[in-house]
Amino acid sequence: MIRPFLASVTRISDLSATNITTTKLARANWNTGDYVVGKVLDTRGHLSAIELSGGRMIEVMEGDLVVGALGTRVATLEAVGDWRAIDDSGEFNALTAAGLFGKTTSLSPFLASPMHLQYHGHVMRNQAKVTMRGSLPEIEITGFDIPVILIVGTSMSSGKTMSGRVIVHLLSQMGLNVVGAKLTGAARYRDMLSFGDAGASAIYDFVDAGLPSSAVDEATYREALPYLLSLIARDKPDVVVAEAGASPLEPYNGAIAKEMIRDHVKFKLLCAQDPYAVVGVQTAFQRSPDLVAGGAANTDAAIALVKKLSGLPALNLMDPSSHAQLEKMLRKALDL
């Protein structure tokens, strides 16, 4: 078999390019989180980048093999897809560059067509499927009692990761042991790696709990999140900067994530694309964040409109002059 490329959803496994054995399985035996191999089809007019297990991006070519995992994506601004939509042809797409595999069912007109692949088989070992959750080491599920700075958004691409980097950097500069985490969303290692670059001593996301995305049934997510929180707790951080994917109202289980860590959230940042979206979140959840950032705070006019519409403070975190005020707010929230 051609040596395959291992997408970043495989980083929790012991798979390597030299130990991949595949078998084609009947659809009744497929499930979320199964590691599968896809053969890249025509790349003309399609996205062709894959994020490797270490985070490096590569461009694949027609005929290359890629190892990823079956999953679901429900992005409001880019692509929607599900492995359950794969038909008898066995053709599917890379719904993210991290190797989240499924069939695209809806695509933004502003996004190039996702990578097109042909089902080559399930990754097998000792006549059993190799899966994401089956690759996890057993750990003790412990209580979680760590202060959390929670970042939520009105949608994807609302400024959450950029804001998270700023917060991680400020907290680490204060001498705190900071862990970065992404609790919900669709697999992509790049965002968490950027938290590490900003000063986080460790980074985790739902992939570390065996999920290709958090768009799974509620019971599965409620089982996976304590595993993720226990991983974080083992590092004994002073504070966790946690991103809750896109909007809590989207089917990524963001509302459940908020519920399960609610008692530990010391500061909540809402990233919004415009001031009116801030009001939408206030109305939907009947509660307000401590601060607004993202596109809704790009200019003085936007900040003033946020205040007028919602009564909330907003900061343009892309402007370094705002960081002193943010630091003051964080110190107060963490009682430093």
Residues of each region from the PLM?
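Short glycine/serine/threonine-rich phosphate/pyrophosphate-binding segments
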Residues: 160-166, 188-192, 248-253, 277-279
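N-terminal accessory targeting/assembly segments
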Residues: 1-76, 81-91, 97
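Fold-independent oxyanion-binding glycine-rich loops
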Residues: 40-41, 69-71, 106-108, 153-155, ...
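C-terminal accessory "lid"/substrate-recognition subdomains
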Residues: 1-36, 188, 204-205, 210-212, ...
